[in-house]
């Protein structure tokens, strides 16, 4: 929170100050409105309407930001969800599949969140275009999955990509390679909002461009923006007119987020005859997931609570694996009709995430964002489904990439499944050091991906390279201290080993 708002909060505690505070907030809103109007005048005629919608959306979000004070949840009101509000996946699966699978599939639209760049893994351009398996990218695998469904069941499930202004151009260039595939692909852009100065709370952008000194002035406001952007794009109405009823939304970097026919059947043919408007897939927490958002019961409705909303005194309790056993995978099944109704009623309520950033020049700014899952409380008859961990396979780092490239997984029609040769269903814990952060460096350090079928835990730190056909089993820790280098020789088998010091293998 900025110093400006902190000062206002102090003023709240003084008698008669709330009226003064109200005036200050109104002045600030007026200043922001004027700045946004100035920015809008710089828009070319072909981008005027689109820019106006974006800036109007930002103004509403900014207004809400000024109204909110303190943590957005009252900890005393948080309860565990009732038993029937989170169903085990096994129960959903036990209902089986309908005789006519194509009839339910034809009601579905697959939406992938494709706004992110590959910068955290040292790549330029959209993250979805990074190669993850046999030179297939995230996007390739997604298209293969949906094409397989359409061919197998003779259906017409479309793929929709929610791009950001950061990923749109590069993604569209690549889409032509799928022209021959049996998948209709649509795109729409999430909004482009102005970053605001942390102290003055005014937009730092001077015009609508996002090049030159304005490059850092704009941001995509989180995936909660999907509801407004999807509606504004016209695609929502198009799909409703075509008879589609549900969207399956997931992050494009979650390789476990495939279309699940059992969940879809449960949505289309509910046992009690009452359709769910919103289903969130959750899975059991491990100690690695303590920061993930969790589903709770709050004021009589299911509500997603994120760590940022929790009062400081209760953060440890929130992280507890025993009290809050599940977390949100961000695999969501949402009724198209409900999105349209709520969007038109302006009734989708999502908590604001205040994301502070420091720009390259040292300026401190704030991004106001929302998360797609936070809207669960706005929908009727919402449900959580506790799914197997295999439906949550995100690739955020090269450590994750090593797992999905390895023989732990088999690839079939774009879907990754745990190898049958792995004796236990858990995934090894892999921690690669900073020398492996960038994909380019990571690939250079592995002549081939090691055999990891019997691996439990791998930690690698420092200047380490792996020869061909290395096998890793049990717990393996490899640490090259500063100035040292370790080359793991081709064909080496490391089982429950700690390797440190210096090990050079030189060609002769």
Swiss-Prot record:
This is UTP--glucose-1-phosphate uridylyltransferase. GO terms for molecular function: D-glucose binding; identical protein binding; metal ion binding; pyrimidine ribonucleotide binding; UTP-monosaccharide-1-phosphate uridylyltransferase activity; UTP:glucose-1-phosphate uridylyltransferase activity. GO terms for biological process: brain development; glucose 1-phosphate metabolic process; glycogen biosynthetic process; UDP-alpha-D-glucose metabolic process; UDP-glucuronate biosynthetic process. Keywords: Acetylation, Cytoplasm, Magnesium, Metal-binding, Nucleotidyltransferase, Phosphoprotein, Transferase. Residues 502-503 are annotated as: Critical for end-to-end subunit interaction. It comes from Mus musculus. Pathway: Glycan biosynthesis; glycogen biosynthesis. The active site is at 396. One of its GO terms (cellular component) is cytosol. The modification N6-acetyllysine is found at residue 438. The keyword Phosphoprotein applies. Gene3D superfamilies: Hexapeptide repeat proteins, Spore Coat Polysaccharide Biosynthesis Protein SpsA, Chain A. UTP binds at residues 113-116, 127, 190, 222, 253, 396. It catalyses: alpha-D-glucose 1-phosphate + UTP + H(+) = UDP-alpha-D-glucose + diphosphate.
């Amino acid at each position: 929170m900025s110093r400006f708002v902190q000062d206002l909060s102090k003023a709240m505690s003084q008698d008669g100050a709330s009226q003064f505070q109200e005036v200050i907030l109104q002045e600030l809103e007026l200043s922001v409105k004027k700045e946004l109007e100035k920015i809008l005048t710089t828009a070319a005629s072909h981008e005027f309407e689109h820019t106006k919608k974006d800036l109007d959306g930002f103004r509403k979000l900014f207004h809400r930001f000024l109204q909110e004070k303190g943590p957005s949840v009252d900890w005393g009101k948080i309860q565990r969800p009732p038993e029937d509000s989170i169903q085990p996946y096994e129960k959903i699966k036990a209902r089986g599949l309908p005789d006519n699978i194509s009839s339910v599939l034809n009601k579905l639209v697959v939406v992938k969140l494709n706004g992110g760049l590959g910068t955290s893994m040292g790549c330029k351009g959209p993250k979805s275009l990074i190669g993850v398996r046999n030179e297939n990218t995230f996007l390739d695998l997604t298209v293969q999955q949906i094409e397989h469904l359409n061919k197998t069941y003779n259906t017409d499930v479309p793929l929709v990509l929610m791009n950001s202004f950061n990923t749109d151009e590069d993604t569209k260039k690549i889409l032509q390679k799928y022209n021959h595939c049996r998948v209709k692909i649509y795109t729409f852009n999430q909004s482009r909002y102005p970053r605001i100065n942390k102290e003055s709370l005014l937009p730092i952008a001077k015009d609508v461009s996002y090049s030159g000194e304005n490059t850092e002035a704009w941001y995509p406001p989180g995936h909660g923006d999907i509801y407004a952007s999807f509606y504004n794009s016209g695609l929502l109405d198009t799909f409703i007119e075509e008879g589609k009823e549900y969207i399956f939304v997931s992050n494009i970097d979650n390789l476990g987020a495939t279309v699940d026919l059992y969940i879809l059947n449960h949505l289309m043919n509910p046992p009690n005859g009452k359709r769910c408007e919103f289903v969130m897939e959750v899975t059991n927490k491990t100690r690695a997931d303590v920061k993930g958002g969790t589903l709770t019961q709050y004021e009589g409705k299911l509500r997603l609570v994120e760590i940022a909303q929790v009062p400081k005194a209760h953060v440890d309790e929130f992280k507890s694996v025993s009290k809050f056993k599940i977390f949100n995978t961000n695999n969501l099944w949402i009724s198209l009709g409900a999105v349209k109704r709520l969007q038109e009623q302006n009734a989708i309520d999502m908590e604001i995430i205040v994301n502070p950033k420091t720009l390259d020049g040292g300026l401190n700014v704030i991004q106001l964002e929302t998360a797609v899952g936070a809207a669960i409380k706005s929908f009727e008859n919402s449900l959580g489904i506790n799914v197997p961990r295999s439906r949550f396979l995100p690739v955020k780092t090269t450590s994750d990439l090593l797992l999905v490239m390895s023989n732990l997984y088999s690839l079939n029609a774009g879907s990754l499944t745990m190898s049958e040769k792995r004796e236990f269903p858990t995934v090894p814990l892999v921690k690669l050091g900073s020398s492996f952060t960038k994909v380019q460096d990571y690939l250079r350090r592995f002549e081939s991906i090691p055999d990891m079928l019997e691996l439990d835990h791998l930690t690698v730190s420092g200047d380490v390279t792996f020869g061909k056909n290395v096998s890793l089993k049990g717990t393996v820790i490899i640490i090259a201290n500063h100035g040292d280098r370790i080359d793991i020789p081709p064909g080496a088998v490391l089982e429950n080993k700690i390797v440190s010091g210096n090990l050079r293998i030189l060609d002769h």
